Curated annotation (Swiss-Prot):
Zn(2+) 3 binds at C248, C253, C269, C271. Residues 380-529 are annotated as: Ariadne domain. It comes from the Eukaryota. One of its GO terms (molecular function) is ubiquitin conjugating enzyme binding. The gene is arih1. This is E3 ubiquitin-protein ligase arih1. Residues 154-365 are annotated as: TRIAD supradomain. Gene3D superfamilies: 1.20.120.1750, Zinc/RING finger domain, C3HC4 (zinc finger). Residues 77-125 are annotated as: UBA-like. Autoinhibited by the ariadne domain, which masks the second RING-type zinc finger that contains the active site and inhibits the E3 activity. Inhibition is relieved upon binding to neddylated cullin-RING ubiquitin ligase complexes, which activate the E3 ligase activity of ARIH1. Signal peptide: none annotated.
Length: 529
């Protein structure tokens, strides 16, 4: 835009937002901060839904006591992330002294790496730098503006909608291309909302790659939700490029976790979500991120469909079309019109040499036939193995979902128990039991991912014994919590629940300590999928 004076990214509760579409380009321009957007018409409830409520920071460890006390982190709001971004821009601008919007574009080009930007900025070739970043050198703006000044006396046609407007209704970037306010607004809204573009929106003129600065976007967009979407896209770039920051993966949560160093550690967001900072998945102890990624991919893609096809069908030995046997006869005829090969289902050899052996193949010792059968058996064994671990993984996942619903039932039971002369403190054992139950379910779920890739050795046998013991105790605890509690059985069930959840807690700790000891001593060997 024509002027960047007075533009800054700071929050200012006193500042008013100017939304007049035909305002002079030298008037005060909007800031990128959320406070200004709220003043522009975003209600408190809308803002809470988009940005998350609350402020300040939460330091680990979080609930449950599982987190490493030495792994410190903060949970930041979108506003606090914006302030971090502002501070980064300010630090760079103290040296290069460019308009804030230009500096933001330069930093985005270098993935918010201040050192790389500084190095390139002072290597003596500024024109090449600004060209690569798709912005006009700020030192040449005044000359460009003079070359592109129009006569204000005549109506001019917009080059997008071809309607005539006074010159005052046109605006543009430093490249000199000007369009009417309405076309600008619709163009920017489409780019932001429909295409999800933020930092890479270019001038709408054909062949022009100059990027639209933040001032222009915030001045020409009137919908406060579009502005917040744009702000989120810009801050998302800042977060994604910073290895110490990670968005909370929970749906509709706009908090960011900031750590002192990146690692595969559990972190708790203010929304209640616990996740692995390294990979962003739900916390998945004892399996490492690498193997969990492979497992998720294996479950999501069509690899197991391929396994089923390999286990239940065979390829025609001539044209390699997949064939499923639908009768008892071993004499197979390929249905491919261009093939029509006849072969034996058992050995996959040509049918003609079989003579009259219609239901009995006597060619088991031929190398090619044996190799085909061996491959078939391996595929079947691999499929059965995958289904074994997948079924147990999914079973614990489903049970975990049911157990989360237990909290409501437990709350009701706690209220009933308080009516039978038990204090609030005395009934807290039920909530503690559900907490432990959910932790055990989660751990057991991921032990099956760990076991799927684990090679058999003496340590794996110990692991499987620990897993079986924890699994059995978890099922017993789950059964206790689902029972109806009467006055007569109150004390008995309380003792059983307390004993069992303490045992589960202890066995879970033993299992995890053993797995981590194996990591430290390099005891585990893996099956490459």
């Amino acid at each position: 835009m024509d002027s960047d004076e007075g533009y800054n990214y700071e929050f200012d509760d006193e500042e008013e937002c100017s939304e007049e579409s035909g305002a002079d380009e030298h008037e005060d321009e909007l800031e990128l901060g959320e406070v200004e957007l709220v003043e522009a018409g975003l209600s408190g409830s809308e803002r809470a839904g988009l940005c998350g409520e609350g402020g300040g920071s939460a330091l680990g460890p979080g609930p449950g006591g599982e987190e490493d006390e030495d792994y410190r982190y903060e949970v930041l709001t979108a506003e606090q992330i914006l302030q971090h971004m502002v501070e980064c821009i300010r630090e760079v601008n103290e040296v290069i002294q460019n308009p804030a919007t230009i500096t933001r574009i330069l930093l985005s080009h270098f993935n918010w790496d201040k050192e790389k930007l500084m190095e390139r900025y002072f290597d003596g070739n500024l024109e090449k730098l600004f060209s690569e970043c798709h912005v006009i050198n700020p030192s040449k703006k005044s000359r460009t503006r003079q070359m592109n000044t129009r006569s204000s006396a005549l109506d001019m046609p917009c080059q997008i909608c071809y309607l005539n407007y006074p010159n005052s209704y046109f605006t543009g970037l430093e490249c000199g291309h000007k369009f009417c306010m309405q076309c600008w607004g619709e163009y920017l809204t489409t780019k932001i909302i429909e295409e999800g573009m933020g930092q890479t929106i270019s001038c709408p003129a054909h062949g022009c790659d100059i990027l639209v600065d933040d001032n222009t976007v915030m001045r020409l967009i009137t919908d406060s939700k579009v502005k917040l979407k744009y702000q989120h896209l810009i801050t998302n770039s800042f977060v994604e490029c910073n290895r110490l920051l990670k968005w909370c993966p929970a749906p509709d949560c706009h908090h960011v976790v900031k750590v002192q160093y990146p690692d595969a550690k559990p972190v708790h967001c203010k929304c209640g979500r616990q996740f692995c900072f390294n990979c962003g998945e739900n916390w998945h102890d004892p399996v490492k991120c690498k193997w969990l990624r492979k497992w998720i991919k294996k479950c999501d893609d069509d690899s197991e469909t391929s396994n089923w096809i390999a286990a239940n069908t065979k390829e025609c030995p001539k044209c390699h079309v997949t064939i499923e046997k639908d009768g008892g006869c071993n004499h197979m005829v390929c249905r491919n019109q261009n093939c029509k090969a006849e072969f034996c289902w058992v050995c996959l050899g040509p049918w003609e040499p079989h003579g009259s052996a219609w239901y009995n193949c006597n060619r088991y010792n031929e190398d090619d036939a044996k190799a085909a059968r061996d491959a078939q058996e391996r595929s079947r064994a691999a499929l059965q193995r995958y289904l074994f671990y997948c079924n147990r993984y999914m079973n614990h996942m489903q049970s975990l979902r049911f157990e989360h619903k237990l909290y409501a039932q437990v709350k009701q039971k706690m209220e009933e128990m308080q009516q039978h002369n038990m204090s609030w403190i005395e009934v807290q054992f039920l909530k503690k039991a559900v907490d432990v139950l959910c932790q055990c379910r989660s751990t057991l779920m991921y032990t099956y991912v760990f076991a799927f890739y684990l090679k058999k050795n003496n340590q794996s046998i110990i692991f499987e014994n620990n897993q079986a013991d924890l699994e059995n105790a978890t099922e017993v605890l789950s059964g206790y919590l689902e029972r109806d509690i009467s006055q007569d059985s109150l004390q008995d069930i309380k003792q059983k629940v307390q004993d069992k959840y303490r045992y589960c807690e202890s066995r879970r700790r033993v299992l995890l300590l053993h797995v981590h000891e194996g990591y430290e001593k390099d005891l585990w060997e893996y099956i490459e999928d």
